[in-house]
């Protein structure tokens, strides 16, 4: 694989206001403390750390209808979009360490500024495609995709803090994997727009090999293009990632998570990656936190070439005789 698929720019995004539970802003810290950067370097990656974004507190951030913390969420994603665009212009794969999944508005927007033809693979128990009008919780981490989709332009009210957002992907540019907790309004949007998805039912029926074959053929079949993988750790079963805000039983296994990421790496087209919703405050025990963090690290390493079959550099003296 080319050196390009191992050239990474890391952005920490310690932000939690897209959802109600404290602790997810510690995600970047615990992923770094687990040795993520060192491990990436050990597997021959060229890693540049852009540090953690400084998110200022926005006072008087009153709700918009029932949408909570709109200005804080909008501003955080605006900052992240600028930083991701910078990383992409520097020729690196952007690796965003979240933080809650509302940040994908910024991550994908920034990526699309440099690569407008990107395709998105969204691994999650949830579709995160509620609009500010269909949401029942008001939490923006359940709404990022609705802000990004061109087909929903005109269906999204003018939420304070979001005037900078321009929808940048079409319904045909995204594939979901791992769905198992989808609101009725979200299901209506999926079906109406004809969005490609593999719920856990499809994963069970087809197997993860077929799911990835179909996903990559759907996104890359007509033309090779950059891939943005937005990975919510709650896409995996809570037995592997318990320390997260909205766990749902019956998720992807550790092995299925690794298979998804190994296959994406093998395309050589991974261009942006989000690792979202690791919340160390929500582990019932220290071991649950460690398990969640270690799983998130393993998923990340597989995105950049770590293979379960093993890896090696050229070993000249073992070359077969001519």
UniProtKB/Swiss-Prot annotation:
Positions with a binding annotation for substrate = 126-130, 137-139, 183, 246, 277
Instruction: Describe what happens upon changing residue 74 to V.
Output: In ARGIN; 9.3% of wild-type activity
Question: Which residues does the annotation say bind Mn(2+) 1?
Answer: 101, 124, 128, 232
Q: Which GO terms describe its cellular component?
A: azurophil granule lumen; cytoplasm; cytosol; extracellular region; extracellular space; nucleus; specific granule lumen
Membrane spanning residue stretches: none
Tissue specificity statement from the Swiss-Prot or TrEMBL entry: Within the immune system initially reported to be selectively expressed in granulocytes (polymorphonuclear leukocytes [PMNs]). Also detected in macrophages mycobacterial granulomas. Expressed in group2 innate lymphoid cells (ILC2s) during lung disease.
Q: What keywords are assigned to this protein?
A: Adaptive immunity, Arginine metabolism, Cytoplasm, Disease variant, Hydrolase, Immunity, Innate immunity, Manganese, Metal-binding, Phosphoprotein, Urea cycle
What EC number(s) does this enzyme carry? 3.5.3.1
One Pfam match: Arginase
Q: Which cofactor does it need?
A: Mn(2+)
Cofactor binding comment, as recorded: Binds 2 manganese ions per subunit.
**InterPro entries to which the protein is assigned, alphabetical:** Arginase, Ureohydrolase, Ureohydrolase_dom_sf, Ureohydrolase_Mn_BS
Q: Does the keyword Metal-binding apply?
A: yes
What are the subcellular locations of this protein? Cytoplasm; Cytoplasmic granule
Assembly: Homotrimer. Interacts with CMTM6.
Q: What does this protein do?
A: Key element of the urea cycle converting L-arginine to urea and L-ornithine, which is further metabolized into metabolites proline and polyamides that drive collagen synthesis and bioenergetic pathways critical for cell proliferation, respectively; the urea cycle takes place primarily in the liver and, to a lesser extent, in the kidneys.
Query: Which protein are we looking at?
Result: Arginase-1
Source organism (scientific name): Homo sapiens (Human)
């Amino acid at each position: 694989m080319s050196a390009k698929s191992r050239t990474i720019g890391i952005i920490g995004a310690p932000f939690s206001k897209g959802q109600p539970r404290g602790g997810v802003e510690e995600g970047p810290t615990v992923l770094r403390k687990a040795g993520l950067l060192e491990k990436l370097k050990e597997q021959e990656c060229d890693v540049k750390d852009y540090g953690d974004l400084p998110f200022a507190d926005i006072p008087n951030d009153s709700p918009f209808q029932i949408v909570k913390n709109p200005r804080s969420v909008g501003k955080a994603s605006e900052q992240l979009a600028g930083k991701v665009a910078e990383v992409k212009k520097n020729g690196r794969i952007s690796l965003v360490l979240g933080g809650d999944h509302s940040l994908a508005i910024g991550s994908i927007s920034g990526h699309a500024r440099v690569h407008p033809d990107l395709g998105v693979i969204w691994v999650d128990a949830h579709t995160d495609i509620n609009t500010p009008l269909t949401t029942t919780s008001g939490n923006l981490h359940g709404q990022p995709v609705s802000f990004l989709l061109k087909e929903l332009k005109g269906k999204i009210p003018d939420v304070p803090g979001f005037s900078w957002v321009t929808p940048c992907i079409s319904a045909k540019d995204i594939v979901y994997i791992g769905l198992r907790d989808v609101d009725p309004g979200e299901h209506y949007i999926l079906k109406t727009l004809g969005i490609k998805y593999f719920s856990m039912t499809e994963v069970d029926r087809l197997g993860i090999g077929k799911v990835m074959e179909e996903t990559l053929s759907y996104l890359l079949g007509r033309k090779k293009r950059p891939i943005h993988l937005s990975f919510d750790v709650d896409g995996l079963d809570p037995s592997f990632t318990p320390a997260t805000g909205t766990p749902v039983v019956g998720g992807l296994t550790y092995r299925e998570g690794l298979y998804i990421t190994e296959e994406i790496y093998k395309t050589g087209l991974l261009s942006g990656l989000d690792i979202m919703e690791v919340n160390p405050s929500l582990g019932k025990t220290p071991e649950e936190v460690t398990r969640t963090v270690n799983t998130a690290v393993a998923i990340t390493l597989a995105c950049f070439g770590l293979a379960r079959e093993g890896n090696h550099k050229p070993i000249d003296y073992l070359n077969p005789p001519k």
